[in-house]
Structure formats: structure tokens, C-alpha cells
Regions:
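Conserved beta-strand segments that form the floor/walls of ligand-binding pockets within enzyme
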Residues: 10, 127, 182
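Nucleotide and nucleotide-moiety/phosphate-recognizing core
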Residues: 2-11, 15-96, 105-106
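Flexible, gly/pro- and Lys/Arg-enriched active-site loops
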Residues: 49-54, 72, 77-175
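Glycine-rich phosphate-binding P-loop
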Residues: 181-188
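A short, conserved beta-strand element in the Rossmann-like catalytic core
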Residues: 16, 102, 188
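Short acidic donor-binding/metal-coordinating loop in glycosyltransferase active sites
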Residues: 13, 99, 185
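A short, charged/proline- and glycine-enriched loop
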Residues: 4, 174-180
Length: 188
């Protein structure tokens, strides 16, 4: 059994200070869910499925020892803390932050609360383009296609424009300045 799992999340915001909210969200995810390793560029894209102001979207990959359900529960709490209000009405709405689990390793899961991989990822450029930018060796476990293949086949023709970059939290540690790193503890 793996101790660390690779999780791809999609973040979106179309209310308030969109970029600042996404940056704050990434910091909280890094502290509370798992180690954020890579972050895609931030894209601006039109609202999908409803009329509203444009979204800022990005994808990130993190490593965690939490289960898919634990990750979901943590991100729902983070969304609420960052101002997300769920009305319970059917359909899409503007939001300060939206965090979706796109992939968890290459697991296929279908429960009432969580479906993996995200069941609409292949239909959304605002998910596919940032996911591609993570440059992961990932294959959709149901469609047996890579992210570039999914992009080539999507029917979504919405324009997504890269507008910003956000450094990953670990990028501020200058590892190249160290000759070695020692880890304390038992080996074996």
C-alpha cells in the first residue's frame, strides 16, 4: 500500500480578489492537505454552465497520505473558510473559491459524494489545460488517454488565457545551495 498519493486539484475563483484567493487557498492546502509540488499557470476562462464574471483557474499536484474521502472533507472545510457558500440549489453559481479533486493516483471511484477521476474533466478546457501544464505522466484510468489526448478530443472550445504564475510553496527553499540533506530516524 502506498504511503503517499498523488492528487491533482483544480482551483477556481470568480468573486472578489480571484488571484489572492487562489494563492491563499494553495497555502492552506499545502499546510493542511498535502505537500504542493507543482502549480500550473493561472488561466482566465469564461464561466462554464452559467452566465457570470470570468474565472481564474489553475491546477496543482500534491502528495498526501490522506484517503480520497479525507481529502474531500478537508477541501470542503477550506472552501467554507475561504468564503464559499453552498446554497443547495441545482446548477452552477459564482463562488469565491472552488476546489475539485480531478485525480487521485489512477483510482476509479464512484460514490454519492465523490467520483474519480472527475466525471467532467474531459469536457472542460479550464481543467485540461492547467492539468496538461503540470506535465505529469498520468493516464485517464477509464478512457485510457493522456491529458493531451483528452484536450485534442474535447468539444469545449472556450478560450482560456494564461494570466499569472504562482510559485509552489517548496520553490522558496534553495535546495541547490545544500551539499547534502540529513534525515533523522531509523532506516530499514
Amino acid at each position: 500500500m502506498k504511503s503517499q498519493h498523488q492528487v491533482v486539484l483544480s482551483l477556481g475563483s470568480n468573486q472578489g480578489q480571484r488571484l489572492e484567493t487562489i494563492i491563499q487557498c494553495i497555502d492552506v492546502l499545502h499546510l493542511e492537505v498535502g505537500t504542493v509540488l507543482k502549480i500550473s499557470p493561472v488561466y482566465e476562462s469564461p464561466a462554464w454552465g452559467f452566465e457570470s464574471t470570468p474565472f481564474y483557474n489553475c491546477a496543482l499536484v500534491l502528495h498526501t497520505n490522506a484517503s480520497p474521502t479525507q481529502v474531500l472533507n478537508k477541501i470542503l472545510k477550506i472552501e467554507k473558510r475561504l468564503g464559499r457558500v453552498r446554497t443547495g440549489t441545482v446548477g452552477y453559481a459564482a463562488r469565491s473559491i472552488d476546489i475539485d479533486i480531478i485525480a487521485y493516483d489512477e483510482i476509479v471511484l464512484d460514490t454519492e459524494k465523490l467520483q474519480l477521476p472527475h466525471p467532467l474533466m474531459q469536457d472542460r478546457n479550464f481543467v485540461l489545460l492547467p492539468f496538461r501544464d503540470l506535465q505529469l505522466d498520468w493516464m485517464h484510468p477509464i478512457f485510457k488517454k493522456s491529458v493531451p489526448e483528452l484536450i485534442a478530443e474535447t468539444t469545449d472550445n472556450s478560450i482560456c488565457q494564461a494570466v499569472a504564475t504562482i510559485p509552489a510553496p517548496l520553490s522558496s527553499i534553495p535546495l541547490e545551495k545544500f551539499n547534502y540533506i540529513a534525515f533523522e530516524g531509523n532506516i530499514g
